[in-house]
Design a protein with these regions (language model features):
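Regulatory modules associated with amino-acid/nitrogen control
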Residues: 1-44, 50-60, 73-100
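A generic structural motif
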Residues: 59-68
């Protein structure tokens, strides 16, 4: 399987037709400009996450985003862009197959 193959296509290639969900976990300083800059990375690509959850606790902002059908290359690129946002401290990604 090529690393440039979209995750959804990879799921079909190995016989599993369940959708692939990419998850981003972002830890940042709790500053007003962080959330719009993170969501902009999806919006300017015409992507709408299936799930967005954020929690501010003191000076820490935690953001969890889930989006279906995002290719590995684009996922990695968006994660690199997130890491360049001022105030973002950590970005982790994972992908899973949704059942159903």
């Amino acid at each position: 399987m090529s690393s440039s193959m979209p995750l959804a296509a990879a799921a079909r290639a190995d016989g599993d037709y369940s959708p692939v969900c990419v998850c981003f976990s972002v830890q940042a300083r709790a500053e007003p400009g962080v959330m719009p800059r993170v969501v902009e990375l999806f919006a300017k690509r015409g992507l709408v996450p299936q799930r967005w959850h954020s929690t501010a606790s003191g000076s820490v902002l935690a953001i969890d985003v889930q989006i279906d059908g995002l290719g590995r290359d684009l996922c990695d690129y968006i994660a690199r862009c997130m890491r360049q946002i001022i105030g973002v401290e950590t970005v982790l990604t994972s992908d899973t197959r949704r059942s159903g």
